[in-house]
Amino acid sequence: MSISSDTSGSVPGSPIDLEPESETICHWQSCEQDLLTLDNLVHHIHNGTTSNLRLISNINSILDHIGNRRPKYTCEWDDCPRKGMVQTSRFALVAHLRSHTGEKPFICSVPECDRSFTRSDALAKHMRTVHEADTLRPSDPIPKAHPMHPQNVANAMVQSAREARAQQQMHGVGNTNEDVENWLDAASMPKTSHDMYRLQKRKLQWVKEERTMLANHLEALERKLIDARNRKEKILNEIVKQVDPSISR
């Protein structure tokens, strides 16, 4: 997905209220280089170059745009009402320039949604209003008490799988992991990529639980093996002493 996909929301300090169309020409101090794509333009502005140097006709015009570790950062975009005004930081200047370029780096994480935004708060508003994530910001973890918390979803799936496996045992049906895997596939029937993602997370939780159970079983067997070896050594020592008391192991 391109970073120039549709969006809503604007950048504080934007020269216009409407969201700009994606730009490909650099208007920083009359640079006027056409970078052909928004990705190339953003790379050009941020790094003073482009990922495709063959696009550049005047190498001197691409140097020292935003720069790094400068004492002050100002927008030098032609026709910008805030041109020459000092920004609070390089980060603030980068955010401001999105109003000129149309860059939208904040992408909705819902698989079936293709929206992207210039600002993180615009993405948060989209998540609340469109995807009904009322109590969560995009960066917030899902509360453990929430029914959609991965652990709760996984636990419910594991419990259902255990019940199905118990039914299989009662009827003399094999209870291999493959049986449970097939049951999970048949029960879930994912219809969207988001459903598939959730299913795979549930399967991952199932695998982790099985791994923990097997690790505990292995640890118990290793303890039994050590005890058996110790008993063997003790018995062997007793036998050797009886055969030849002068021999000490």
Curated annotation (Swiss-Prot):
Signal sequence segment: none
Which SUPFAM superfamilies does the record match to this protein? beta-beta-alpha zinc fingers
UniProt GO BP: CENP-A containing chromatin assembly; DNA repair; DNA repair-dependent chromatin remodeling; regulation of transcription by RNA polymerase II; transcription initiation-coupled chromatin remodeling
**Taxonomically, which superkingdom?**
Eukaryota
The main place the protein resides is nucleus
The protein's matches in InterPro entries, at most eight in alphabetical order, are given as: GLI-like, Znf-C2H2_ZIC1-5/GLI1-3-like, Znf_C2H2_sf, Znf_C2H2_type
**Keyword field:** Chromatin regulator, Cytoplasm, DNA damage, DNA repair, DNA-binding, Metal-binding, Nucleus, Repeat, Transcription, Transcription regulation, Zinc, Zinc-finger
Q: Which Pfam families match?
A: zf-C2H2, zf-C2H2_15
Q: Which stretches of the protein fold into C2H2-type zinc fingers, per the record?
A: 73-100, 106-131
List GO terms (cellular component aspect): chromatin; cytosol; Ino80 complex; nucleus
Subcellular location(s) per record: Nucleus; Cytoplasm
One GO term in the molecular function aspect is: zinc ion binding
What does the protein in this record do? Component of the INO80 complex which remodels chromatin by shifting nucleosomes and is involved in DNA repair.
Describe the subunit structure: Component of the INO80 chromatin remodeling complex.
Under which name does UniProt file this protein? Answer: INO80 complex subunit 1
Organism expressing this protein natively: Schizosaccharomyces pombe (strain 972 / ATCC 24843)
Task: Name the gene.
Answer: iec1
